[in-house]
Amino acid sequence: MTRQRATQRKERERQAVATAAIVGYTNAGKSSLLSLVSGSEVMARDMLFATLDTTTRKIELPHGQPLLLTDTVGFIRNLPHRLVEAFKSTLEEAVLADFLIQVVDASDPEAVRHYETTLEVLNELGAGDKPMIVVLNKVDLVPEERRGALETLLAPHFSGRVVPMSVKEGNGEGLSLIHI
């Protein structure tokens, strides 16, 4: 599997196709986001490690340029070292991506902590300095005040853009921004 991924990466580099990795805490909606923007079904379940391997889909950006989006395994706090090693090949996609899309579950009371955990893991992997868009997902499930508070709490941690949306509903003011 590792050899196959390496071959696929070399082909992407040869074709000069931009890549983005969808990262975030487990059950934040990463696979659902990939399904939404690619128009193809990606398995998404409300359970730990529903995604065990990467899934990549090619989308076309509004200006016609192709982009390869890769769904990665969800992060969890205090991930045992042996699991980090087991998921290394899938986590490697974040390191090799041109930029990252971090999905944060706005309805989770631990949303900020999960966001910070994801940043810590990305830093440990050597991907913490990648350009990033943060998707504040499931905003349809939280009051407007909570959404605003979350955006305010996340803003100091990074210099990118926070995109509020509901992946499940397929809407939100940020949906068009996801198409970078």
Model-derived regions, located:
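Conserved G1/Walker A P-loop phosphate-binding module
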Residues: M1-R77
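Flexible beta-alpha connector loops of hexameric P-loop NTPases
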Residues: E41, V73-L83, D105-A111
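Helical "lid/switch" subdomain of P-loop NTPase nucleotide-binding domains
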Residues: L48, L83-A86, H114
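Conserved alpha-helical scaffold flanking the Walker A/P-loop in AAA+ ATPase domains
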Residues: T55-K58, A86-L91
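Active-site glycine-centered loops adjacent to acidic/histidine catalytic or metal-binding residues
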Residues: D71, N137, S166
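Conserved C-terminal guanine-recognition region of P-loop GTPase G domains, centered on the G4
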Residues: K88-G160
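Conserved AAA+ ATPase "SRH/arginine-finger" region at the nucleotide-binding site
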Residues: P164-G170
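Conserved small/polar residues in nucleotide/adenosyl-binding loops
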Residues: I178-I180
